[in-house]
Regions:
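N-terminal mature-domain "stem" immediately C-terminal to a signal peptide or N-terminal signal-anchor/transmembrane
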Residues: 1-41, 45
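Acidic/histidine-rich, surface-exposed loop or edge segments in extracytoplasmic proteins
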Residues: 49-64
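Single conserved hydrophobic/aromatic residue that forms the stacking wall/gate
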Residues: 178-188
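Acidic helix-start/capping segments at beta-turn-to-alpha-helix junctions
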Residues: 93-104
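Zn2+-dependent metallopeptidase catalytic core
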Residues: 68-87
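Loop-centered beta-sheet repeat module
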Residues: 107-162
Length: 188
């Protein structure tokens, strides 16, 4: 079932399978002989792992309702579209488990949010993450209050990367999320 769902999002699937859960190679996803013998069994093993079940349960409890986040992202995208005449009428948002590898990705024309990265600093799973990989200052940012700003920072880095620094991106993010009335009135 997971294999069938992920096939609809080939970029995310490749990232998830090969890099995030490190289950196998890219050709395992497209080679019919390897799908049945490698891919599906590895995905089943992953889904049935007791640790994964605990993490999935924690994600479900923390994010039992996600519509408010989608609404705020939609408003921000509308502001972005107004400022840049981008013609964005709808941002497709998806959520996934990143194996603690990614906060926000843009793959397959979808903005993907790794919910495991926002369980909260006080979450027992987050507390158990190794401090050499996840120092305390990083765990402090693993909070759902950062989802919206992380989505827009990632989106702006993808579409308006500035190698000279992120001051422009910070100004744009602030404008998209907090400007009222219209940003055009402010910047002409």
């Amino acid at each position: 079932q997971l294999h069938k769902s992920l096939r609809n999002y080939p970029e995310l699937y490749e990232n998830f399978y090969t890099r995030m859960i490190r289950a196998g190679e890219k050709d395992h996803l497209s080679n019919p002989n390897k799908i049945d013998s490698f891919t599906i069994p590895k995905l089943q093993h992953f889904l049935n792992d007791s640790s994964m079940k605990v993490i999935f349960k924690s994600i479900a409890a923390t994010f039992n309702e996600f519509d408010d986040y989608k609404e705020k992202i939609s408003v921000g995208m509308g502001n972005y579209s107004d400022i840049f005449n981008a013609g964005i009428t709808h941002a497709q948002i998806g959520t996934f488990y990143s194996n603690f590898n990614a906060t926000v990705l843009e793959n397959d024309h979808v903005i993907w949010i790794g919910l495991d990265m926002y369980l909260g600093n006080d979450n027992d799973i987050v507390k158990m993450l190794p401090p050499n990989t996840f120092p305390n200052y990083y765990k402090q940012k693993m909070d759902k209050k950062y989802i919206i700003s992380d989505v827009f920072f990632s989106f702006l880095m993808t579409h308006h990367f500035n190698p000279m620094g992120d001051e422009l991106l910070a100004r744009m993010l602030s404008c998209l999320l907090y400007t009222s009335p219209s940003p055009r009135d402010r910047y002409g």
